[in-house]
Amino acid sequence: MITVSNVSLTFGGQKLFSGADLKFMPGNCYGVIGANGAGKSTFLRILSGELEPTTGTVTIPAGQRLSTLKQDQFKYDAYPVLDTVIMGNQRLYDIMKEKDELYAKPDFSDADGERAAELEGEFAEMDGWNAESDAATLLTGLGLPVEMHTMLMGDLKGGEKFKVLLAQALFGNPDILLLDEPTNNLDNRSVAWLEDFLMNFPGTLIVVSHDRWFLNNICTHIVDIDFNQVKLYVGNYDFWYESSKMMQSLMNDQKKRREDKIKELQAFIQRFSSNKSKAKQATSRRKLLDQLTIEQMPASSRRYPWVCFTPEREAGKDRKSVV
């Protein structure tokens, strides 16, 4: 679970969003959408604790493990692929390495034996014996062939590294999973496998993606970053699209009615303010006019493609005929 309270962010003098109050619950998948530059990836960095918000707080219950899709494809170049995936649960990986170092000591002492026993107990509780097979299953599902599982990360291509880092994020049943564009570099089969995995994920899942089909298949909620606000909608991408259009239409209608009312009052005041018999009514309407305000709607950060072809001349009315 993640609780976001009054979070705002100003970046480079520009306000990306403000007053965000959200609660992300286990068992739900939240798709984060918005225009390029709206702050989707930045919002994920705030949730993960990598970036401090300008105002507000992000709260995660103690003991919950958070996993993110790493973006640095060169960080693990010196490590084998399987080890890189297992690093998704850093505590488990540290236990495995410390065990190996202890058992490799030529002067293995009683103290070393006691420490090894402690590590073995924790290792078993974390299902460590299945770590390599679990990592291999993730890699295979994402389309990385078995022969690459023992290679060094530095020997892989960019798309192959991405699959390893995605497997790393998925590894070890985290309580909270944050994924930024997870379908990049995946073919259709791997995307289908990932959808199935995420639909069965029991924790709190938050995904940034431009793939509306992917979001439709996995999301229970949509988080829309637009108009310098972060709003939560129940439902998948299509439901958000219809709901947001309806909400925008209602806001436009409300603004139009208020504008029409102001024009009506202004016309009455202008017409009858000098008429003694209508003076009280004009004064009453002036007070009402002073109470009416038109809230300026912030501009949307979305830009939709638009193409217009202007003809050089008007089209003829008669079709060409041959006699």
Regions found by a protein language model. Name each.
Residues 1-255, 309-323:
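ABC ATP-binding cassette signature C-motif
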Residues 298-314:
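Short, flexible cytosolic linker that couples an ABC transmembrane/permease module to its adjacent nucleotide-binding
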